[in-house]
């Protein structure tokens, strides 16, 4: 039986598996994910899930039953340590997965800032569920938060934090927020909108 191994349990990895089944592939499909949750939608991380208005299971693409019905095997909390393309094996800490076809769908990782106290408990990167869960432990009204980055995600987080009663400052390296993706007029609109909500924006 032909075996497809998908490394990455995000949007691309999950939809690769779904598409294979939809197109009639009847071989074995294995997804390896280093996260502890079924593949999920990430946009709510900076919105409803951040505001604790959405349960984790509501963000999942599909239920666990769906993967079982479609015979898609998912290995969560699993990190690939090495891949042998000669023998077609992917090696984890305690297992080995052979494959006929290998799909890399690992997505992106946030750029870590070179700074002192980089492991501080009040420094967060927003990329996955566990990041937001860590933030939930620190978020309380009237605290001050500094967001580095005035892109769409930064603005979404700022809006959520204002709703939660925090004092928010955005630091943007460019001359204006959203500079890389919008016109000056649109940037000014969002600048004014968030400023009126109480967000301090420094470019």
Map each language-model feature to its residues:
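Short, conserved glycine- and acidic-residue-centered signature motifs
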Residues: 125-128, 154, 183
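FAD-binding core/adjacent interface of flavoenzyme oxidoreductases
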Residues: 1-5, 63-146
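A Rossmann-like FAD-binding core segment of flavoenzymes
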Residues: 26-28, 74-91, 97, 164-203
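Glycine/Thr-rich phosphate-binding loops of Rossmann-like dinucleotide-binding domains
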Residues: 112-113, 155-156, 179
């Amino acid at each position: 039986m032909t075996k497809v191994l998908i490394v990455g349990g995000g949007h691309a990895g999950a939809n690769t598996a779904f598409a294979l089944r939809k197109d009639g592939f009847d071989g074995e499909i294995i997804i390896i994910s280093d996260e502890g949750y079924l593949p999920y939608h990430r946009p709510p991380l900076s919105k409803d899930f951040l505001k604790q208005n959405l349960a984790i299971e509501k963000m999942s693409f599909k239920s666990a039953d769906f993967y079982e019905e479609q015979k898609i095997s998912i290995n969560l909390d699993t990190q690939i340590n090495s891949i042998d393309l000669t023998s077609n094996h992917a090696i984890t800490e305690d297992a080995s997965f052979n494959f006929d076809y290998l799909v890399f769908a690992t997505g992106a990782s946030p750029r870590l800032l070179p700074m002192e106290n980089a492991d501080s408990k009040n420094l967060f990167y927003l990329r996955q569920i566990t990041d937001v869960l860590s933030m939930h432990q620190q978020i309380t009204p009237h605290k001050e938060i500094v967001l580095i980055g005035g892109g769409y995600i930064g603005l979404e987080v700022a809006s959520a934090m204002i709703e939660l009663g925090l004092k928010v400052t955005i630091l943007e390296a460019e001359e204006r927020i959203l500079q890389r993706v919008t016109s000056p007029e649109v940037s000014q609109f969002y600048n004014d909108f968030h400023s009126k909500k109480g967000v301090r924006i420094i470019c």
